[in-house]
Amino acid sequence: MTEYPHIPVMLEESIQGLGVIPGGRYVDCTLGAGGHSEAILEHSYPGGQLLSIDADPKAIALAAERLKCFGSSVLLVNDNFANLKDICQRYEYMPVHGILFDLGLSSMQLDREESGFSFQTEAPLDMRFSPGQELSAADIVNTYDLAGLSDLIWKYGEEPFSRRIARAILEKRPFKTTTELASVIEKAVGGRHGRIHPATRTFQALRIAVNEELSHLESALAQAQSLLGHGGRLVVISYHSLEDRIVKQYFQKEAKGCICPDDIPQCVCNHKPSLRLINRRVITPSDEEISRNPRSRSAKMRVAERIIQPGEGRFFHSRAKGLVNHVSETGSVRYGQAKHKGVVQRGGS
């Protein structure tokens, strides 16, 4: 029997946040080992459909085995969620009832030594989510100048010793392995100070830079919103403050009505809210989950619901019936089923 080492974080909260219904159509933007995808398929039965995306071909292969019992209900795509809208258009998979992002590293990726995400074991300085990417962590630490490296470690790692670490890296490079780099970082900051390893923030910064995680997230949130039907849910689980800040600010901006400056007495922007915040406060794992899965302790979940204004001519759905509807420019409603062409594992462009 195949074992799936990654324990999905806030699984029950994710299903509730998405509002999964039988016959619904969903997107899992971060497939990983397939735990969230499996639960979405189970709760959307009968008639549910799921498109799951991952940049890591090994994740696709593992999840394909796990989800094969769902047959044509699931489509696995080896691509980056930065291309979310193009993927959905390619497979005529729109509009959708819900979209999930479970950001950051899966336990499977973290434990895979050859990927170089962890400093606990010796491995090549890689950190690429997809082997097709050109830039690696080794490229950054071995070629960036002092200012560029220091700024990167501060911006993406929020590391207070960024300049000291960058200077030590320049003095000791070139680097080939994770343990070499971690050792230099630890010495640069004077050893351990508390529970967190001194290299943690720098490794986070390198991983974010290599995979362009923050810019991809910003782009994908807007794409996801455009794919949701009226009442559709957008659920995002983040693991550090940089990710959560992007999600929080995006949700708040899109949930606002008027966005005119305060010194303008009358609204002239005509901006309408396109999202409704389901939870005003961030959702965090229970103490029980954290004790069961310590890697969930930093997780934060935010949930928003799509609002489509009358006259937009955009798809929406009835959550109660799970029907795909269409609001015309005149406000009339047409009921129908959207197409779903793909049912097999595919490679992305």
Swiss-Prot record:
Transmembrane feature ranges: none
Protein's cellular compartments: Cytoplasm
GO cellular component: cytoplasm
Reaction equation(s) it catalyzes: cytidine(1402) in 16S rRNA + S-adenosyl-L-methionine = N(4)-methylcytidine(1402) in 16S rRNA + S-adenosyl-L-homocysteine + H(+)
Keyword Lipid metabolism annotated: no
GO molecular function, one term: rRNA (cytosine-N4-)-methyltransferase activity
Binding site for S-adenosyl-L-methionine: G34, G35, H36, D54, F81, D102, Q109
Top class in the EC scheme: transferase
Metal-binding listed as a keyword: no
Domain of life: Bacteria
InterPro entries, per database record: RsmH, SAM-dep_MeTrfase_MraW_recog, SAM-dependent_MTases_sf
Name of one Pfam family that matches: Methyltransf_5
One GO BP: rRNA base methylation
Keywords per UniProt: Cytoplasm, Methyltransferase, rRNA processing, S-adenosyl-L-methionine, Transferase
EC number from the UniProt entry: 2.1.1.199
HAMAP family registered for this protein in UniProt: 16SrRNA_methyltr_H
PANTHER family: 12S RRNA N4-METHYLCYTIDINE METHYLTRANSFERASE, S-ADENOSYL-METHYLTRANSFERASE MRAW
Function noted in UniProt: Specifically methylates the N4 position of cytidine in position 1402 (C1402) of 16S rRNA.
Homology family: Belongs to the methyltransferase superfamily. RsmH family.
Protein name per its UniProtKB record: Ribosomal RNA small subunit methyltransferase H
Organism: Dehalococcoides mccartyi (strain ATCC BAA-2266 / KCTC 15142 / 195)
Gene name of the encoded protein: rsmH
